[in-house]
């Protein structure tokens, strides 16, 4: 009986280590919803208020998060210097993301995969994604790079051999200007990055001490250095973007 328990313990330990050591490749074409809305932003501005209303009615978690963020936005907006064309909904979307909704939002964004049908029929954050994309685009300073860090627990990322050591995250990705803050989130994989498209959202955040910079999933990075033993990356923005989807909402209307 003791020998059997020892065998089971060894077996479980071995497989747990394999699971924890699982490596996930990063490349330049992750299958996630990553629309930049190029060429259709004016059209989206007209239809997205209706989309937002519908999604709030059908998604209580999102409704509660959006309404709470809306109240916070009313308080902090007068204290902020905002870029031209920055709408209330942009600010609300950023605040909502820094709250508790980001987990459900990111999971839904990943679950779309590369499927237009999934986006059309299952994605419940169409309005949130649009407003957040516009907010990050307006808040970002593309003329200069910002040094940020990102720590991840439980996942070992590696650069894919198929993408020429150029990668992107595919979804909105949080990072920090403070290396200590980033390491508090994990060190299973660790990123040191120079971002050109990331937006400093510290003043919007529920946790301003985290000095958060939000990186859009479409930004391309060159892997300058990767340490396999520690899964540490040094990434430099290429200054370019790439996305699988564009103007997906209007293309979905044409699909039957």
Language model features by range: what are they?
Residues 106-114, 238-256:
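C-terminal helix/juxtamembrane-tail motif
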Residues 42, 46-195, 199:
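Internal glycine-rich, Lys/Arg-flanked active-site/core loops of soluble domains
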Residues 15, 34, 143, 147-152, ...:
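Processing junctions and N-termini across compartments
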Residues 22-43:
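Short N-terminal segments immediately surrounding and downstream of signal-peptide cleavage
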Residues 163-245:
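ADP-ribosyltransferase catalytic core
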């Amino acid at each position: 009986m003791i020998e059997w328990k020892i065998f089971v313990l060894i077996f479980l330990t071995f497989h747990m280590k394999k699971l924890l050591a699982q490596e996930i490749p990063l490349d330049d074409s992750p299958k996630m919803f990553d629309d930049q809305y190029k060429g259709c932003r004016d059209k989206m501005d007209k239809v997205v208020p209706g989309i937002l209303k519908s999604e709030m009615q059908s998604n209580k978690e999102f409704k509660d998060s959006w309404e709470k963020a809306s109240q916070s936005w009313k308080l902090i907006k007068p204290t902020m210097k905002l870029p031209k064309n920055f709408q209330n909904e942009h600010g609300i979307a950023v605040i909502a993301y820094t709250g508790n909704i980001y987990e459900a939002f990111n999971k839904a964004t990943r679950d779309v995969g590369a499927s237009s049908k999934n986006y059309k029929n299952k994605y419940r954050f169409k309005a949130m994604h649009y407003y957040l994309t516009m907010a990050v685009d307006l808040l970002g300073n593309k003329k200069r790079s910002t040094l940020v860090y990102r720590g991840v627990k439980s996942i070992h990322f590696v650069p894919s051999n198929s993408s020429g050591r150029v990668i992107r995250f595919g979804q909105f990705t949080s990072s920090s200007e403070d290396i200590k803050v980033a390491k508090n989130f994990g060190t299973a994989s660790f990123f040191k990055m120079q971002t050109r498209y990331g937006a400093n959202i510290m003043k919007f955040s529920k946790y301003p001490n985290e000095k958060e910079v939000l990186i859009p999933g479409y930004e391309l990075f060159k892997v300058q250095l990767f340490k396999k033993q520690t899964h540490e990356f040094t990434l430099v923005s290429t200054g370019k973007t790439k996305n699988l989807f564009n103007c997906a909402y209007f293309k979905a209307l044409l699909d039957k």
